[in-house]
């Protein structure tokens, strides 16, 4: 009987030890996600300078050391002729200043790679008399690895 009691007591302690380790795994923090907020004017006049900013954060902290940040700009229907711009950052904000030469609906897209993640939010821009309401907006594309 003593042996049975010792075995049961040992088993209970062993199971209790395994159980406490499991609860720690369940309370582990969820991994942070790369967040990119793309902002800038959605209506501009041809020849007018416009600034677009990608504020990059990871959790609550600004990302000042992204692996790569570029802006891509193209006129609707002409993505094959898009232009890529490398930009510099200040306090986690990456900025593009550009000028649209002619009327039309354009897309400004930031490509951000940081913390082994990639995010590509887009913003539609109506230049001059172009009718942005008749055009479909593109979805934000984000890839997390």
Curated annotation (Swiss-Prot):
Q: Give the span(s) annotated as Disordered.
A: 116-145
InterPro entries in the cross-refs: YtkA-like_dom
The protein here is known as: Uncharacterized protein YtkA
This chain's source organism reads: Bacillus subtilis (strain 168)
High-level lineage = Bacteria, Bacillati, Bacillota, Bacilli, Bacillales
Q: Which gene encodes it?
A: ytkA
């Amino acid at each position: 009987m003593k042996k049975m009691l010792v075995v049961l007591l040992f088993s209970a302690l062993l199971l209790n030890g395994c159980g406490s380790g499991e609860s720690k795994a369940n309370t582990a923090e969820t991994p942070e996600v790369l967040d990119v907020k793309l902002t800038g004017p959605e209506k501009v006049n041809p020849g007018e300078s416009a600034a677009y900013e990608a504020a990059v954060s990871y959790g609550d902290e600004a990302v000042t050391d992204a692996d790569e940040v570029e802006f891509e700009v193209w006129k609707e229907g002409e993505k094959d002729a898009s232009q890529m711009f490398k930009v510099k950052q200040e306090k986690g904000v990456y900025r593009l200043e550009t000028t649209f030469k002619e009327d039309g609906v354009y897309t400004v897209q930031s490509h951000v790679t940081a913390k082994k993640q990639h995010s590509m939010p887009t913003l539609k821009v109506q230049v001059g008399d172009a009718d942005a309401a008749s055009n479909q907006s593109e979805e934000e594309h984000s890839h997390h690895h």
